[in-house]
Amino acid sequence: MAGATVTVEEVRKAQRATGPATVLAIGTATPANCVHQADYPDYYFRITKSEHMTELKEKFKRMCDKSQIRKRYMHLTEEYLAENPNMCAYMAPSLDARQDIVVVEVPKLGKAAAQKAIKEWGQPKSKITHLVFCTTSGVDMPGADYQLTKMLGLRPSVNRLMMYQQGCFAGGTVLRVAKDLAENNRGARVLVVCSEITAVTFRGPSESHLDSMVGQALFGDGAAAVIVGADPDERVERPLFQLVSASQTILPDSEGAIDGHLREVGLTFHLLKDVPGLISKNIERSLEEAFKPLGITDYNSIFWVAHPGGPAILDQVEAKVGLEKERMRATRHVLSEYGNMSSACVLFILDEMRKRSAEDGRATTGEGFEWGVLFGFGPGLTVETVVLHSVPITTGAAITA
């Protein structure tokens, strides 16, 4: 038998990219139906036929007032809920009705975001080699990744990964996975899509489960897409952020802090009060592990993209780390304008940050800073930490130290 003309090492080297994975485009989408937070308690208690629960409604109103959310977008309309009263009860069998919505609408909303990202990227869809699709909303086979491949007209040979039931940390997870795919497959262009619809979690109020009502006050619908690739061709591709490192960890003593369970009644949501405390208590360790190798100890000298699980989490992280209010501006803006869209949030924040940085004449896509951090927080308690490197917006502009 003739000897091989190349070695495994040579093959491996040829397969791998030279530079770091880079975000090349971002697109976002929401349903048309906009819900204003100030009006939501009246609407929510009316549509769920719970107006007799006056004290509970007052509690819910206070939750909405404290949420720092101005508006959210929701696929579920009053008409649809009126036709499906089981979805408005706290615990009534309704999974079929919920699945009927999300199986169709999750890929459809993902398509809207993906089309915007592909348009900004400016390259043919045939150059997309990988698809990573993430949703906490429903499960199906073949999955939303398959449906989106068909809807967009991607190549049948695109390498797909479907991530179901991850939760709010998964905006970091998809970037971590996309980084590995892009850097280990020379020439790869990874389409990442997070699409979330609250039809699986919407339910009526319960006096014995206030944690469920917290979710009803916070969650909104949205989809975000990014194109990730290494070694960008800067004649036709415009880098936005480099993905420098990515890691995941389970916080100590946090089991049961955030849970979701798929049942006949839909996806139930369970939350312990000390979630903000657990996250803030451990945030410095995550920052040290990520930034010590870079010689960075001043966390006001980096840009911040933090999953806005709720205002209490952001407040306690700011206090623990000693952050200036401006560091969380983009994060709080997305929370205010869209609510908590689970995995899609951090990608919305990246989009807001790069756009606002350009509008404000900042030197880089990261509010003028060179380095940044992206955090995902969710069930586990699981934390995703992604170190980002911005790119200059104007050639020769100084980067804020």
Swiss-Prot record:
The species this protein was found in: Sorghum bicolor (Sorghum)
Keyword Membrane: no
BP terms from Gene Ontology: flavonoid biosynthetic process
Sequence similarity: Belongs to the thiolase-like superfamily. Chalcone/stilbene synthases family.
Cited PANTHER family: CHALCONE SYNTHASE, HYDROXYMETHYLGLUTARYL-COA SYNTHASE
Entries under PROSITE patterns matching the protein: CHALCONE_SYNTH
One Pfam family hit: Chal_sti_synt_C
Transmembrane segments: none
Highest classification ranks of the organism: Eukaryota, Viridiplantae, Streptophyta, Embryophyta, Tracheophyta
Active site per database record: 168
UniProt keyword terms in alphabetical order: Acyltransferase, Flavonoid biosynthesis, Transferase
EC nos: 2.3.1.74
Described purpose of this protein according to its UniProt entry: The primary product of this enzyme is 4,2',4',6'-tetrahydroxychalcone (also termed naringenin-chalcone or chalcone) which can under specific conditions spontaneously isomerize into naringenin.
Reaction(s) this enzyme catalyzes, per UniProt: (E)-4-coumaroyl-CoA + 3 malonyl-CoA + 3 H(+) = 2',4,4',6'-tetrahydroxychalcone + 3 CO2 + 4 CoA
Signal peptide positions on this chain: none
Record's keyword annotation contains Transferase: yes
Name of protein: Chalcone synthase 2
Listed GO MF terms: naringenin-chalcone synthase activity
Pathway: Secondary metabolite biosynthesis; flavonoid biosynthesis
